Regions:
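A conserved FAD-binding loop/helix module that cradles the flavin
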Residues: 68, 516-538
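N-terminal glycine-rich phosphate/pyrophosphate-binding loop and immediately adjacent elements
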Residues: 6-149
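Flavin-binding catalytic cores
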Residues: 366-387, 432-472
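A glycine-rich dinucleotide-binding beta-alpha-beta segment and adjacent secondary-structure elements
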Residues: 200-211, 389-395, 453-520
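Extreme N-terminal leader/targeting segments of oxidoreductases
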Residues: 1-18, 36-37, 505, 546-556
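Mid-domain catalytic core of redox enzymes
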Residues: 233, 242, 262-267, 272-406
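Glycine-rich, aromatic-lined ligand/substrate-binding cores of catalytic
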Residues: 326, 332, 348, 390, ...
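Active-site/ligand-binding neighborhood in enzyme catalytic cores
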Residues: 138-251, 258, 476-492
Length: 556
């Protein structure tokens, strides 16, 4: 039985109980839970399609993921789907790590030893260093066993059974607190930490260069545990988006696309879209870029000086902060069967061509007096080296689900971390299209060296997504995929796991926030978690409001 009854019929057609802005996984999660409680909820999305950075698109019969290449459960994703009554089949998604001609597949924790053996073959002068680093990885994996040792209680039925409380939840909470303290002692940047273990910069870069810049040590090393948790939804990552959409609509929720919120009047609780639509609300959830949120608040209509001061403080706090590294992705359609790529890369691979890594390559090489050079040759030569010594993440959907490419063909998704400001600079120099062609040819060349000679002859179509195109599409600061950069000092948002419930609150009581900009480190599981926490906070406030209006009798 639902605790809430929608007030839709008693108010104008432009009034809703809750407006959710942004249809990424955080917004979809929150809307699903709010609609489940029969609140009158409206989800607004500025693009023509929902899903944000999660989901896929179809090109000539190939289904290609636009964001996450796979799904990490983290004790959150599968319990969330189960709680909502959504049944999705998840397929195997083994991770390969390939460096030069050396390769391993991570299937269980014992494979970390094989990873260490591979590193020792590549760097025989650093065997003792590698042994120490392996112990660090295994130490973090043990902490992860506790942190994700049970399914997140937030997504389990309540009230909890006594047996679960006494034998599972309470013992886990005790261990959780102890291990979060251990985790908090490992928040130095991963490269700095590894320099206390080895002086081989190539070894350091090979381990870390596919992580976001300045990633804290614990979160970087925890990926060796998370790699074992990767799964792939049958039908592509779009399956999750479609199932959540279907649930929202079946529960009476509403979704409107091509509606970009341009103004929020926090006093009258009204929003206005760029398309001229106006809505009033009781509660609002912002599940999009934080900078954009504070920019669309109409400060002229705020009567409370205290509230205005808090909002202006937030604006100032975020104005010079940078988003995390963005990603450049090349989508390639090949007239070759999947097995040509399967033996080398598998369905999901981190492929590094050169064991030297990015140790001798830096953005500073193409900067002068803090500005990027305008010398085209210098820029393109640097990009060539950057790709050659970098780590490419290669995802091949058809190797997980054979229905995702036409028979005898393969769709490849090849990506690497890339700097937003550099792409913006190339665009300003009118080199954007040439840059995309250049980097595509580099990717194909390196894939060809590992797979099929003259691979370019078999590639019949390519599409390139850059940090700039991500920023234009999503309005995410600097085209970020995972919120704020760890390099920001001070860090602009909450990062302490024990305070994550508070992260969804904003200075405005009637507005909550969720998604990658709300809590770091961000990703699909954390975005889902903040979406659920935000929906719980909204439901609590709505219950409180209805209780006051009815004198509390219905809720005593």
């Amino acid at each position: 039985m639902n605790i809430l009854t929608s007030s839709w019929r008693s108010k104008s057609m432009n009034h809703v109980d809750v407006i959710v802005v942004g249809s990424g996984i955080a917004g979809l999660t929150a809307t699903a839970y709010l609609s489940k409680e029969k609140l009158n909820v409206l989800l607004l999305e500025k693009e023509a399609e929902i899903g944000g950075l999660l989901g896929s698109f179809n090109v000539d019969g190939h289904v290609l993921d636009k964001g996450a290449r796979g799904i990490i459960n983290s004790g959150i994703v599968i319990p969330m789907l189960r709680q909502l009554g959504i049944d999705i089949e998840f397929l195997s998604n083994p991770i390969k790590i390939t460096i030069g001609s050396q390769t391993i597949t991570l299937t269980d924790e014992s494979d970390i030893e094989r990873y260490g053996s591979m590193l020792k073959q590549l760097y025989p002068d650093n065997i003792c260093d590698i042994d120490i680093i392996l112990k660090d990885i295994q130490y973090v994996m043990k902490i992860m066993d506790v942190l994700y040792g049970v399914e997140n209680p937030l997504f389990l039925p309540k009230p909890y059974e006594m047996d679960y409380l006494t034998h599972t939840l309470l013992p886990w909470i005790f261990k959780f607190v102890i291990n979060t303290r251990k985790m908090s002692k490992m928040l130095d940047p991963i490269n700095d930490f590894l320099r206390t273990r080895t002086n081989n910069e190539s070894l350091i870069m090979i381990i870390t260069q596919h992580f976001f810049s300045m990633t804290p040590t614990f979160f970087a090393l925890s990926y060796f545990k998370l790699y074992l948790q990767y799964h792939y939804p049958k039908g592509s990552t779009q399956t999750i988006v479609d199932q959540l959409k279907s649930l929202i609509l079946s529960n009476g929720g509403k979704i409107e696309t091509n509606q970009e919120v341009m103004r929020i009047d926090v006093e009258s609780k009204q929003i206005t879209t760029a398309q001229g639509q106006r809505y009033s609300y009781d509660q609002l959830l912002w599940a999009a870029d934080t900078n954009a949120f504070y920019q669309v608040i109409d400060r002229n209509n705020i009567r409370s000086r205290k509230l205005l001061s808090k909002i202006e403080h937030k604006i100032k706090r975020y104005e010079n902060k940078t988003g995390a590294d963005s990603v450049l992705t090349g989508y390639m359609l090949a007239d070759l069967p999947p097995q040509y790529f399967g033996n080398i890369f598998g369905p999901h691979c981190f492929y590094t061509v050169r064991k030297e890594g990015l140790a001798g390559i830096s953005l500073e090489d193409i900067r002068q007096d803090g500005m990027f050079t305008k010398d085209k040759k210098r820029l393109f030569d640097w990009i060539s080296d950057f790709v050659e010594y970098n780590t490419l993440e290669i995802s091949i959907p058809v190797l997980r689900d054979p229905t995702l490419s036409p028979e005898g063909q393969t769709g490849l998704i090849v990506s690497l971390l890339f700097d937003y400001q550099l792409v913006k600079h190339l665009d300003e120099l009118k080199l954007y299209e040439e840059f995309k062609d250049h980097i595509t040819s580099l990717m194909i060349k390196h894939l060809s060296n590992a797979t099929v000679e003259d691979l370019n002859k078999y590639i019949r179509k390519t599409i390139v997504s850059t940090p700039l195109s991500i920023a234009r599409k999503t309005h995410n600061t600097h085209g970020s995929l995972t919120g704020w950069s760890f390099a920001n000092k001070p860090f602009p948002t909450e990062y302490r796991i024990i305070r994550i419930a508070k992260s969804v609150l904003t200075p405005v009581d009637s507005i909550k926030q969720a998604g990658q900009w709300t809590f770091n480190p961000a990703g699909v599981p954390v975005s889902i978690l903040t979406g659920k926490l935000a929906s719980d906070a909204i439901i609590k406030d709505v219950v409180k409001s209805i209780s006051k209006k009815k004198g509390g009798s219905d809720f005593e």
